[in-house]
Design a protein with these regions (language model features):
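Low-complexity, acidic/polar, glycine-enriched regions of mature
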Residues: 21-208
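N-terminal signal peptide c-region/cleavage motif recognized by signal peptidases
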Residues: 16-18
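Bacterial N-terminal signal peptides that target proteins for export
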Residues: 1-8
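Hydrophobic alpha-helical targeting segments used for export or membrane insertion
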Residues: 8-14
């Protein structure tokens, strides 16, 4: 009888050990693939744009925005970016121009007060290089755009406990007329150019 029990117990112990090892490995893989929720440090982040006026680039930015960023550099396929920008926060260092841009001639912020980008797919393209494909909505037009971005770095925050800090830089180009920004005489691109260069710099933190 003992000769039968000992092999059975040994087999059970080996089986339970394998199950535990598989469970631990599966847990580690799940944790590695989980997306992390990041908070934007507004004091060290910016969304900027540049558009030509006749021949000269004119720069602007949006002073505030809302961002929901779920990002895991090791599992970009499980990541998501959702950014909403109130048009009223446009700033080109010229109040008259800012008011004109918010008017019916361009963004028409009374009817469409925000623009929004929501990613549908994020892929890694190279070391620390990614591209977020998503839907950009400006006014009443939604189009698919690509937003390439670089993970500048990620580290434990030296001044905040149990926190990581990361930096992201992104850039893309869109045509304002694709989104109906500029109506009537302002749809022409001789005075205000069609190409809009967008650059985004984000400092992010997450709890660990």
């Amino acid at each position: 009888m003992n000769k039968l029990i000992i092999p059975i117990l040994t087999a059970l112990l080996l089986f339970s050990g394998n199950v535990f090892a598989l469970s631990s490995s599966e847990k580690e893989n799940n944790e590695k693939n989980e997306s992390m929720s990041w908070t934007v440090d507004r004091d060290h982040s910016s969304i900027n744009f540049s558009v030509r006026h006749f021949f000269t680039p004119v720069n602007g930015r949006f002073n505030d925005f809302e961002a929901d960023i779920q990002f895991n550099p090791d599992a970009p396929e499980n990541s998501r970016i959702d950014v909403t920008i109130p048009i009223s926060y446009i700033n080109t260092e010229n109040a008259r121009r800012d008011n004109h841009l918010a008017s019916e001639d361009f963004f028409n912020s009374e009817q469409w007060p925000t623009m929004r980008f929501v990613s549908t797919n994020i892929q890694k393209t190279d070391d620390n290089e990614y591209v977020a494909v998503g839907e950009l909505t400006i006014r009443d037009v939604t189009k698919t755009v690509e937003l390439p971005f670089e993970l500048l770095g990620i580290m434990e925050h030296p001044m905040m406990d149990d926190t990581q800090v990361a930096g992201i830089a992104a850039s893309t180009k869109i045509k304002r007329t694709d989104f109906g920004v500029g109506v009537g005489d302002w749809a022409a691109t001789l005075v205000v150019g069609d190409d809009v260069d967008i650059t985004i710099n984000l400092e992010l933190t997450t709890k660990i």
